[in-house]
């Protein structure tokens, strides 16, 4: 929670430097981070570039650094990692470019087999700076669909913080490679005819309850593709 003081507020790059619509900011104004603040950032990338020379790649790194992130969630990575060349893997193309240090984890649909590097969906999570040393474990959606990924931090005593990054598919479209179509294919192969959006909400709800029973404090960074004022995701969260 960051509160404004009476003095002139110092804005970060979230408001001052973003000019392209790929990094358009929504919500409250983001201020200079105060001491003892844990800052979590979320962005829908609409595909993470594979080239370290891509301006979008540089913009994402700059955003992480200048906006003083402790944790970052990227959704719609749109990358099939098994087909990405070694020199284009995240670790290789960011070597020496994140001075504060980082740990990361990407998830994608493991049941697909694209011929190239494009696969719609997927999520990435990053722990940055000194707080990354508090990271005790990471994990992902156990179905292998790449719907969410989490990082678990150890605090004082037995306190734990679980940061979850998730991407809920759009409603059914026309293509066979959309995230909705990928998930629907998986469920039908399991003789499960649930709508992928409904399945997402139900599965995540169960996971949240399990994590809560462990005593974790939980933060969900969600690209919901839904009305968060009165949609199904809002109702699911209200029941937790």
What does each model-identified segment do?
Residues 1-61, 129-240:
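Active-site regions of metal-assisted phosphoester/phosphodiester hydrolases
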Residues 58-138, 236-240:
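Active-site surface patch of divalent metal-dependent phosphodiester/phosphate bond hydrolases
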């Amino acid at each position: 929670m960051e509160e404004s003081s009476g003095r002139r507020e110092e804005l970060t790059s979230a408001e001052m430097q973003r000019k392209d619509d790929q990094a358009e900011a929504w919500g409250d104004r983001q201020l200079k981070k105060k001491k003892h603040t844990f800052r979590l950032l979320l962005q829908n990338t609409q595909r993470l570039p594979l080239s370290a020379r891509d301006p979008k790649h540089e913009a994402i790194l700059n955003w992480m650094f200048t906006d003083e992130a402790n944790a970052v969630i990227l959704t719609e990575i749109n990358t099939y990692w098994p087909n990405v060349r070694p020199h284009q893997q995240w670790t290789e193309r960011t070597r020496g470019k994140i001075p504060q240090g980082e740990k990361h984890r990407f998830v994608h649909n493991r049941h697909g087999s694209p011929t190239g590097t494009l696969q719609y969906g997927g999520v990435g999570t990053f722990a940055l700076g000194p707080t990354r040393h508090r990271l005790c474990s990471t994990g992902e959606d156990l179905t292998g669909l790449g719907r969410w990924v989490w990082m678990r931090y150890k605090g004082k005593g037995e306190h734990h913080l679980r940061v979850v990054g998730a991407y809920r598919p759009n409603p059914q479209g026309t293509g066979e490679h959309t995230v909705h179509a990928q998930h629907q294919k998986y469920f039908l192969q399991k003789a499960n005819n649930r709508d992928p959006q409904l399945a997402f909400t139900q599965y995540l709800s169960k996971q949240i309850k399990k994590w809560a029973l462990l005593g974790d404090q939980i933060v969900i960074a969600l690209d919901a593709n839904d009305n968060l004022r009165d949609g199904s995701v809002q109702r699911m969260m209200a029941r937790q």
